[in-house]
Amino acid sequence: MRRMDKVDLQLIKILSQNSRLTYRELAEMLGTTRQRVARKVDKLKKLGIIRKFTIIPNLEKLNYMYAILLIKVKATENIYQVAKVLKDHEDVKILELGVGKYNIIAHVLVPKDIKKAQEKVNDVIKEINGIEDLEVEFVSDIPKFELL
């Protein structure tokens, strides 16, 4: 993989905060040309460094919240198979694999109504085989969300 220069890193940081900026606006912020920004964005997309341009909705205003599933997969199970099942579930919006007490963390989009949220969590859990331990936490607010 090619080395990223200072402009690449600045570009990624700016886009992670506002992906709607035009190439002209980005060029002004970075002190370069629109053409150079366009080439850099294209290259970062081709390399898979920029995977998508998206928004961060206000879940509170949409009457939704996240249920965080902290999952410990049995040692006899394939963690990647469990992750694939979760990845394919339409309500799982963020999926993380890690090392520690829990080896999978899934963020499930659920209604704010706690009874409906519980039903949605149960729908996701019943699809998973090989759970050794599970904790569910509900996120009531996200005061900060930054990627870089």
Curated annotation (Swiss-Prot):
InterPro entries membership: AsnC-type_HTH_dom, Dimeric_a/b-barrel, HTH-Siroheme_Decarb, Tscrpt_reg_AsnC-like, WH-like_DNA-bd_sf, WH_DNA-bd_sf
Designated name of the protein: Uncharacterized HTH-type transcriptional regulator PF2053
Domain HTH asnC-type: 4-65
Keyword Disulfide bond: no
Keyword terms: DNA-binding, Transcription, Transcription regulation
Domain of life, per lineage: Archaea
Any one GO molecular function term: sequence-specific DNA binding
Keyword DNA-binding attributed: yes
DNA-binding region: 23-42
